[in-house]
């Protein structure tokens, strides 16, 4: 299921957001998408869009990441992902983001066995080896963070 968050902005504000550098937020959790979108809005940071891919039965975070890379005003790609269905596409998108001068920042909650079990029950995702995943995405140029606040802080610093 695809979920968009109501960012409580007018048509004028949406046009203003598109006219300046902004943040795209992609999440596999609808609740996290809403929390982060609200946090970024509270910091007066413009969002190009915030989308939740849910259990990814029809579309994946990689699909929206590839779309976000094509948006000229999107300068920061912030992700909350429990797993990646297409890791090679993710890594290719990360390299493309670097080429375009866009920062990709990732919060991945699968560090502990409890987090991996939670991901499996939440979205049906199978989280792989955390250390291997982290090494690969960092080598591809992705900024990795450990906490939700860091995700918002890094996105804000990169945008300003």
Where do the protein language model's features map onto the residues?
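Catalytic-core regions of core metabolic enzymes
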Residues: 1-160
């Amino acid at each position: 299921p695809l979920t968009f968050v109501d960012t409580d902005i007018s048509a004028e504000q949406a046009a203003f957001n598109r006219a300046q550098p902004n943040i795209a937020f992609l999440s596999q959790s609808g609740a996290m998408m809403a929390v982060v979108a609200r946090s970024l809005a509270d910091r007066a940071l413009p969002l190009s869009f915030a989308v939740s891919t849910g259990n990814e039965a029809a579309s994946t975070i990689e699909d929206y990441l590839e779309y976000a890379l094509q948006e000229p005003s999107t300068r920061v790609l912030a992700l909350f992902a429990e797993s990646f269905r297409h890791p090679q596409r993710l890594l290719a998108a990360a390299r493309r983001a670097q080429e375009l001068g866009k920062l990709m920042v990732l919060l991945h909650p699968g560090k502990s066995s409890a987090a991996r079990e939670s991901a499996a029950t939440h979205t049906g995702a199978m989280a792989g080896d955390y250390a291997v995943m982290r090494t690969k995405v960092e080598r591809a140029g992705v900024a990795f963070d450990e906490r939700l606040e860091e995700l918002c802080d890094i996105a804000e610093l990169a945008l300003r």
